[in-house]
């Protein structure tokens, strides 16, 4: 096996047998068979030969696009906000996983941490992850193939925008800036980097929030530097 990413599964049930192989990327099936009958077989060269080349992104290009693209072209990001905030609201009203988000909104925790904008961002982001990791029947919008990364790139920015009364246009641009920054960083890490992906997504959020605070390109770039300086090296299990 020469693939960086390779998953092979054999299942038997009710006297029947199925096989599946994923290789090259997380959603790329290269072999499927059922009861000995091959449904799909493209195992030769399963890796990256068929993949489209990455768009040569830079932070400057990401920033300029997020701030200058016609606002209607960015409407797709509204769905990320709707889905991921809905997941947070669901978890805040129920018991999911470790209930970290709900706990952070408890009376004792509010007394200690206060009902600040920062604590709300923490609670809502944690709550959405609680719901997802507990298997709640609620969809979330991913980033770079990860639901938690999608949450971390969306919810802090959405909460900040809502609490500060940001306009719909600025909110939309901030969310696009956040998600594209995360994608830009992720391009350099490969599919199976040991670096925690939520660190990358949080770096994207810092850019979106910096923009909502009135920052320009310099401030956004400094936000990236601050995040990378503090969090690089956090390993994912």
Task: Please describe what each predicted stretch is.
Residues 1, 139-143, 206-208:
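Short glycine-rich or small-residue beta-strand-to-loop segments that form or flank ligand, phosphate
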Residues 2-135:
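Signature of multi-pass transmembrane helix bundles
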Residues 63, 78-85, 119-126, 154-161, ...:
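Predominant activation on well-ordered alpha-helical scaffold segments within soluble catalytic domains
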Residues 68, 140-141, 165, 189:
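Short coil/turn segments at secondary-structure junctions
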Residues 112, 116, 144, 148, ...:
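Alpha-helix capping and helix-loop boundary segments enriched in small/acidic/polar residues
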Residues 116-135, 168-185, 231-233:
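Acidic-glycine-rich active-site phosphate/pyrophosphate-binding loop
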Residues 137-155, 196-200:
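Conserved phosphate/anionic-ligand binding catalytic regions in large, soluble enzymes, centered on
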Residues 160-167, 171-173, 183-237:
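Hydrophobic alpha-helical bundle architecture
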């Amino acid at each position: 096996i020469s693939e960086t990413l390779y998953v092979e599964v054999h299942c038997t049930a009710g006297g029947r047998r199925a096989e599946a192989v994923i290789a090259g990327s997380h959603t790329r099936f290269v072999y499927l068979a059922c009861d000995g009958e091959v449904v799909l077989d493209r195992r030769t060269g399963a890796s990256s030969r068929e993949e489209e080349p990455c768009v040569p992104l830079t932070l400057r290009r990401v920033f300029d696009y997020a701030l200058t693209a016609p606002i209607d072209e960015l409407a797709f990001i509204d769905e990320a906000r709707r889905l991921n905030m809905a997941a947070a609201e669901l978890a805040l009203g129920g018991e999911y996983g470790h209930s970290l988000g709900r706990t952070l909104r408890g009376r004792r925790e509010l007394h200690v941490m206060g009902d600040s904008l920062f604590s709300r961002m923490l609670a809502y982001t944690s709550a959405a992850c609680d719901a997802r990791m507990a298997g709640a029947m609620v969809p979330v919008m991913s980033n770079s193939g990860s639901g938690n990364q999608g949450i971390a790139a969306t919810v802090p920015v959405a909460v900040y925008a809502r609490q500060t009364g940001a306009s719909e246009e600025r909110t939309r641009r901030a969310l696009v800036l956040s998600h594209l920054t995360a994608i830009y960083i992720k391009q350099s890490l490969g599919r199976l980097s040991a670096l925690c992906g939520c660190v990358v997504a949080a770096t994207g959020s810092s850019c979106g929030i910096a923009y909502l605070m009135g920052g320009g390109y310099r401030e956004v770039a400094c936000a990236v530097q601050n995040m990378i300086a503090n969090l690089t090296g956090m390993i994912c299990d």
